[in-house]
Amino acid sequence: MTSSPEQLSSTKAPSMMFRSLRHRNARLFFFGLLVSTVGTWMQMTAMSLLVYELTGRATSVGVTLLCQFLPMLLLGVWAGAVADRHDKRRIALLTQSLLAVQAALLGTLYLLDLLTLPIVYVLSVVLGVITAFDNPARRGFVIELVEPSEITNALSLNTAVMTGSRIVGPAIAAGLKGPLGAGWLFIINAATFTAILWPLLAMDRTRLQPVTRAVRGGTPVRDALRFITRDRRLLVVFVVFTVVGTFAFNYPVSLLKLAITRFGSESLFGILLAATGLGSMVGSLITAARPRITTWWFFGNGALLGVSGLALAWAPTAWAAVLCAIPVGLGGAAFVAAQNAIVQQESPADMRGRLLALGAVAFLGTTPIGAPVTGWIADNAGAEWSLGYGSMLTLVAVAIGFAIRWRSTRPQVPADHHQPRTMVVDYADGGGVVP
């Protein structure tokens, strides 16, 4: 008995989507990462609500994000160089341990009634410094868990775990902040780091993929920027990614203001974050199922993010806002996963840490610019515009980037029209013109 093409495709898709999980080390790591990031999103949600309660201003929430992500902007690429030169597993063990200490200190100070806004800002800076080194090491370590042909899938699953945890984390924070208070949510987050520390210690290091470490010396920022500027495709992707990352992903500010001032519900903030998390998980898994990621997938999901963001900003009811938040998360996660995959596809092993760090700078490190701007717009122009302006800028950036890529992939007509036209064909991508 033979299987139909439909049956074959239906059984192949799930295995393609989760093919990285056939490795025990990858299963251990992703399970621990899921538990840990659920706790992280609990803390982020509780922190935004706490700062807003203390000040009543979205601008203060934006300043908190500035403190958290400014170290990423200043240290991100250098931290990526450290990840390229040293054992990424050891770096992740150290940074994850320090993140647990930061969360425990935050919770303890709150429970002792010693936590003030200046202390929140200082601990946010501490969090940012640790995260600047954790991000490239942890994300770069994912590549060591799987075979080279599975790197794109593993990175997409990593994005799915990181963004999918937003479904559970904010929902738990919204439900438990009232009865438990923010302090115990911070303590719970500290405890969740054991879920990622144990796999890092318990995994079989003999099954890790060999990596080429970068040599010491050089100028990591200049090297990474030089590599990108030499590749027009990567350059366009990074510029669009930077614009969108700066202005479109400031959800702790814009969704908080939208939930409280537009719909009068603090708990709706957690529900909106959870809805974007649901969409994010779907978008990441869809991207993970694709054998190769093109720039057209990147631009298409950027457009989805912009359009659905506008719909969310001016949603007429709370439930309409929740429904609109799902495609916002889907487009946003697929957009981020596509950028990560394109960088990995186009970069050598000894440059990946720096390029991942540069991508993190473009996406997270620009938050010190976008978050205060978003908070100021929320306080002075309204919650709708704090989300709407970023969506509009996203559509403009995507349209310009798409136009540049479209022009660069069009076949060139020779000066002698009697000569046949030539095109560069990418057979690995289904035989189409190289995007």
Positions of PLM-derived features:
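Alpha-helical transmembrane-bundle signature of multi-pass membrane transport and export proteins
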Residues: 2-435
